[in-house]
């Protein structure tokens, strides 16, 4: 993954973020669409899971908890996955804060995205009908001295065991089934993700 320097020109997507204008007693106030939805306790987790994105999601979760610790937070996920450590910082915060975090998959939730989807509050994990969910084992590649490669290989096995154990808890599947099903890329349609226990229901239309 490549990163742009801080002084790089903004991307087209950055330039095209819609703005919402509201009338208040003090006049007009404008928000970008994501900030406006944050007021409604909606957080978007989109794209690669990496440290910068994880920090933003964690900050929003903590902010919404401070605003109202008893009201649900809605986390919309459209992600191909990414860094395990970045994803675990989001996961641990979801479990730590007092509000229930309802997760919704739109588009795709793969790898760490699927793990975070399953980590939502029980009974409040959803998938849109044409979304795809994919689980697999952690990926890694290392270079260097043989002893260092051995250390990193052991770390990957430790992470794999931890992720599989947590996924078994969230899905209700036996650990042996999780280990077998995550050995290779395992794609699921919306209904299959419900049957597997990664989510609780398919959302076709808002009530």
Swiss-Prot record:
Q: Which organism is it from?
A: Aliivibrio salmonicida (strain LFI1238)
A Pfam family annotated for this chain is CLP_protease
Q: Which domain of life is it from?
A: Bacteria
This protein's record includes keyword Ribonucleoprotein: no
Output this protein's name: ATP-dependent Clp protease proteolytic subunit
**What is annotated about its quaternary structure and interactions?**
Fourteen ClpP subunits assemble into 2 heptameric rings which stack back to back to give a disk-like structure with a central cavity, resembling the structure of eukaryotic proteasomes.
Q: Which residues does the entry assign to the active site, renumbered to this chain? A: 111 (nucleophile), 136
Q: Name one GO molecular function term.
A: ATP-dependent peptidase activity
Its biological function? Cleaves peptides in various proteins in a process that requires ATP hydrolysis. Has a chymotrypsin-like activity. Plays a major role in the degradation of misfolded proteins.
Known EC number? 3.4.21.92
Report the catalytic activity.
Answer: Hydrolysis of proteins to small peptides in the presence of ATP and magnesium. alpha-casein is the usual test substrate. In the absence of ATP, only oligopeptides shorter than five residues are hydrolyzed (such as succinyl-Leu-Tyr-|-NHMec, and Leu-Tyr-Leu-|-Tyr-Trp, in which cleavage of the -Tyr-|-Leu- and -Tyr-|-Trp bonds also occurs)
Keywords of this entry: Cytoplasm, Hydrolase, Protease, Serine protease
Which cellular component terms (GO) are annotated to the entry?
Answer: cytoplasm; endopeptidase Clp complex
| One biological process term in Gene Ontology | protein quality control for misfolded or incompletely synthesized proteins
Where is this gene product found?
Answer: Cytoplasm
Asked if the record carries the keyword Cytoplasm, the reply is yes
Alphabetized InterPro entries for the sequence: ClpP, ClpP/crotonase-like_dom_sf, ClpP/TepA, ClpP_His_AS, ClpP_Ser_AS
């Amino acid at each position: 993954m490549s990163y742009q320097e801080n002084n790089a020109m903004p991307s087209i997507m950055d330039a095209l973020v819609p703005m919402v204008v509201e009338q208040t007693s003090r006049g007009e106030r404008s928000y970008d669409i994501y900030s406006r939805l944050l007021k409604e306790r909606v957080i978007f987790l989109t794209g690669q899971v990496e440290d910068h994105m994880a920090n933003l999601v964690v900050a929003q979760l903590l902010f919404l908890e401070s605003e109202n610790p008893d009201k649900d937070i809605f986390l919309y996920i459209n992600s191909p996955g990414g860094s395990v450590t970045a994803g675990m910082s989001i996961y641990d915060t979801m479990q730590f804060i007092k509000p229930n975090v309802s997760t919704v998959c739109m588009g795709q939730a793969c790898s760490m995205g699927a793990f975070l989807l399953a980590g939502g509050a029980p009974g409040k994990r959803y998938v849109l009908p044409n979304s795809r969910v994919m689980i697999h084992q952690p990926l890694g590649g290392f270079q260097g001295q043989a002893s260092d490669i051995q250390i990193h290989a052991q770390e990957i096995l430790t992470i794999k065991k931890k992720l599989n154990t947590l996924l078994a808890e969230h899905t209700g599947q036996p650990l042996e089934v999780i280990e077998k099903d995550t050995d290779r890329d395992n794609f699921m349609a919306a209904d299959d993700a419900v049957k597997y226990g990664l989510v609780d229901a398919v959302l076709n239309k808002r009530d």
